[in-house]
Amino acid sequence: MSGTSLDGIDAVLAKIGPNGETVAEDAVSLPFQPELRKALFELQSPGANELHRDKQAGNALALAYADAVKQLLAKSKLQASDIAAIGAHGQTVRHQPQLGELAYTHQTLNPALLAEKTGITVIADFRSRDLAAGGHGAPLVPAFHAQQFSSTEDIAILNLGGIANLTLLPANGEVSGFDCGPGNILMDAWIYEHQGNTFDENGNWASQGKLNITLLKNLLADSFFSKAPPKSTGRDDFHLAWLQEKLGNENHPLEDVQATLLHLTAHSSLEALARHAPQTQTLIVCGGGARNTALINLLKSKSAEFFKHPLKITTSDTEGIDPQLVEGLAFAWLAWAHQQKRPANLPAVTGS
């Protein structure tokens, strides 16, 4: 798995039982080589020789995935023959679900090369069929969240990857979910632009700045936030150029922008949860953002602004799952579901 944040590759060894119960047996995380990260980042925007660059990057990503798989097998003392399949998501470089019958999504990857280099069956291209059926092709993880986290109380899962998405799991009711806005994507882009770091560790830089309320209101005025589900988003909508347009010609302190982006993620996530599932009792956070201490603390302190009752906020660690591994586990589970000929997209989530 490599997500929108472009921070690297997570490879998870998943043991899946006959009813879909899933356990992470082992994992490795590898940072992207700078050349590959640059190639994938540049594909996020139209440019010259795009088709050739996309195919080259897809091959390079397959080789990087293969290296991660081999390292995981060596760490786990397993052989390729011990593995039923690889669920490989690829790197999303375009996501255009709003184009009707011409809607498309594109995840750069050469799955054939990955299969050849590992000797393992590869299951990929998870999103296209859902778009063909009229859906958004995203988010896909709510079906897995329902498998892993369902409870006797009303809970929600907030996945804070590059994009933030919510899965709503009422104790008695239909599972639903949707993308709710930027997760780490803008904070990562801003700190990379100005400090060369790929992410803001623990939200330390954001913690040095102050919230700019006027800027926050300007960011929240984007039409995406007021759209009703089903909805999905990505780097097509939220990117550095979008942010710079919102900033205009004003000379904001850099750390204040980072602090405001932290508030944007927290505010948009809590507001969406309060609007669509005000009865939620527990919010479980996963994804890379779960390791951002400042973001978790902000979610906890701001929750009282949106909920009349105390909202318990925790991370998936409390459920025995490393927050960084949840999405990788989800795509292993989706690959298993495909092999079982079990539909794993949820029309109530994707709109298909």
Residue ranges and their predicted role:
Residues 4, 8-22, 27-32, 176-266, ...:
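Conserved ATP-utilizing enzyme core subdomain
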Residues 1, 82-87, 155-159, 177:
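Short glycine-aspartate micro-motif
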Residues 6, 263, 314-352:
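Glycine-rich phosphate-binding/hydrolytic loop that grips phosphoryl groups
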Residues 93, 280-302:
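Glycine-rich phosphate-binding loops at beta-strand->alpha-helix junctions
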Residues 64-72, 254-279:
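Phosphate/ATP-binding catalytic cores across multiple sugar-kinase/actin-like superfamilies
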Residues 23-60:
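Conserved non-catalytic scaffold segment of RNase H-like nuclease domains
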Residues 48-109:
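Short beta-strand-loop/turn "lid" adjacent to the catalytic site in phosphate-handling enzymes
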Residues 97-105, 112, 116, 120-198:
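Phosphate-binding/catalytic loop of phosphoryl-transfer enzymes
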